């Protein structure tokens, strides 16, 4: 097997519990985004656009939908013979193996896969962020700095910094301190969960971490702080582009709404850094004679007979006559019957809302989760149902 300079390991096994009923049946990287994509499309497309042709996808939580979607990787041009895409679930071997105990342990359990390609560098990715990035430029920076580890970093608002791993650097970009989700952050320079390691350094760090009974086997909590304590050369690579962590209902909703901005739509379809997907091939949209569309994305295979405003409509969705959809996200193959009012709602895949329903109705006081209503996948909402804003519907209401 030809030695690879760099291979990617994509962590895609997370449940995404903060997304509630959206991840009841699928892992977070498989959740639909922007009407056309799955969240994992962004990391896979970045690999393809960066000429990284060997990707291990580490799955765990309810992996069937994600495995089926990725298939052989051809949608991202990652189906090459010498490399390509590989699904890497947890396994039990003769002397080791179990469920992945953390991000670092997930890589540790797949060291045989990495050794097979014997790369000089390892790119560690998360499968649950929305961004477009040239990893080759980051690798060039890593080499230029003679770094042993490079973390991609982005400046976030100070009030949000405690949600992330944050780093303090010197004038040359070398990381002096790193802390995962600190209550009082020293910096607003946040880790994006994108790391480049020299493979020999990572291998040694993983073996050491695995022997520590006190470790959570997590890169941010354990591996990176230990490497800093050892005096290793860790550098930050400052990213100036668009990046969103969509790990909560609020952040997922807001990121979808941002896609409706004209400059963001153009960016997704830019040929130089195009985002690829394995979306099902469907017929074009059908807009009825009374349909009204304002500032919305409408996926292929949709039938729109009502009115849609400031919304993201994924593929295969049906909206009946007299219905009004406002500031909402309709996930694939969901159905809205006649005379429905849907406001600031995320409607799960294959969910059905019968006629005359009112979903996202105003309530007194401050509603939870910024007033975003969420209807889970495959749920049936009976005729005439009224659901207040900010509610999470996890099971059929009748």
UniProtKB/Swiss-Prot annotation:
Question: Which Pfam families does its entry note?
Answer: Hexapep_GlmU (PF24894), NTP_transferase (PF00483)
Keywords assigned by UniProt, alphabetized: ATP-binding, Carbohydrate metabolism, Glycogen biosynthesis, Glycogen metabolism, Nucleotide-binding, Nucleotidyltransferase, Transferase
Task: Enumerate the Gene3D superfamilies for this protein.
Answer: Hexapeptide repeat proteins, Spore Coat Polysaccharide Biosynthesis Protein SpsA, Chain A
Please name the GO terms that the record assigns under molecular function: ATP binding; glucose-1-phosphate adenylyltransferase activity
The reaction(s) catalysed by this protein are: alpha-D-glucose 1-phosphate + ATP + H(+) = ADP-alpha-D-glucose + diphosphate
> Its annotated pathway?
Glycan biosynthesis; glycogen biosynthesis
GO terms classed as biological process: glycogen biosynthetic process
Q: Which domain of life is it from?
A: Bacteria
Q: What is its EC number?
A: 2.7.7.27
The enzyme's first-digit EC class, named in words, is transferase
| Nucleotidyltransferase keyword on record | yes
What does the entry list as the binding residues for alpha-D-glucose 1-phosphate? 100, 165, 180-181, 191
CDD domains hit by this protein: ADP_Glucose_PP, LbH_G1P_AT_C
What's the family? Belongs to the bacterial/plant glucose-1-phosphate adenylyltransferase family.
* Oligomer and partners: Homotetramer.
Q: What does this protein do?
A: Involved in the biosynthesis of ADP-glucose, a building block required for the elongation reactions to produce glycogen. Catalyzes the reaction between ATP and alpha-D-glucose 1-phosphate (G1P) to produce pyrophosphate and ADP-Glc.
- Protein name, entry field: Glucose-1-phosphate adenylyltransferase
Protein species of origin: Desulfitobacterium hafniense (strain Y51)
Q: Which gene encodes it?
A: glgC
């Amino acid at each position: 097997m030809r030695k690879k300079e760099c291979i990617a390991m994509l962590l895609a096994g997370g449940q995404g519990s903060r997304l509630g009923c959206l991840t009841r049946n699928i892992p977070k990287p498989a959740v639909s985004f922007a009407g056309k994509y799955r969240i994992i499309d962004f990391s896979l497309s970045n690999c393809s656009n960066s000429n990284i042709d060997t990707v291990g996808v580490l799955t765990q939580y309810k992996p069937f939908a994600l495995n089926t979607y990725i298939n052989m990787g051809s949608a991202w041009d990652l189906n090459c013979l010498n490399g390509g895409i590989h699904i890497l679930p947890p396994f039990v071997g003769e002397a080791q193996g179990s469920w992945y105990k953390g991000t670092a342990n997930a890589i540790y359990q797949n060291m045989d896969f990495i050794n097979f390609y014997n790369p000089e560098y390892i790119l560690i990715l998360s499968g649950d962020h929305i961004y477009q990035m040239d990893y080759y430029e980051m690798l060039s920076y890593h080499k230029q700095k003679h770094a042993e580890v490079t973390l991609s970093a982005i400046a976030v608002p100070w009030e949000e910094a405690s949600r992330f791993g944050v780093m303090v650097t010197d004038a040359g970009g070398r990381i002096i301190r790193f802390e995962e989700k600190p209550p009082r952050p020293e910096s607003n320079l946040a880790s994006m969960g994108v790391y480049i390691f020299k493979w020999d350094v990572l291998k040694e760090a993983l073996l050491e971490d695995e022997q520590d009974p006190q470790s959570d086997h997590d890169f941010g909590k354990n591996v990176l702080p230990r490497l800093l304590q050892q005096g290793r050369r860790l550098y930050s690579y400052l990213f100036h582009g668009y990046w969103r962590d969509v790990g909560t209902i609020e952040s997922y909703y807001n990121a979808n709404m941002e896609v409706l901005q004209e400059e963001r739509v153009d960016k997704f379809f830019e040929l130089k850094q195009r985002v690829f997907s394995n979306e099902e091939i469907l017929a074009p949209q059908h807009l009825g004679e009374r349909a009204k569309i304002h500032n919305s994305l409408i996926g292929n295979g949709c039938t729109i007979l009502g009115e849609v405003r400031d919304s993201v409509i994924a593929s295969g969705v049906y909206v009946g006559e007299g219905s009004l959809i406002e500031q909402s996200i309709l996930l694939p193959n969901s159905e809205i019957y006649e005379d429905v009012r849907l406001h600031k709602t995320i409607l799960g895949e294959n969910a059905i809302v019968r006629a005359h329903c009112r979903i996202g109705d105003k309530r007194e006081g401050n509603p939870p989760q910024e007033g975003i209503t969420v209807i889970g996948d495959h749920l049936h909402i009976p005729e005439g149902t009224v659901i207040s804003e900010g509610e999470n519907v996890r099971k059929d209401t009748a």
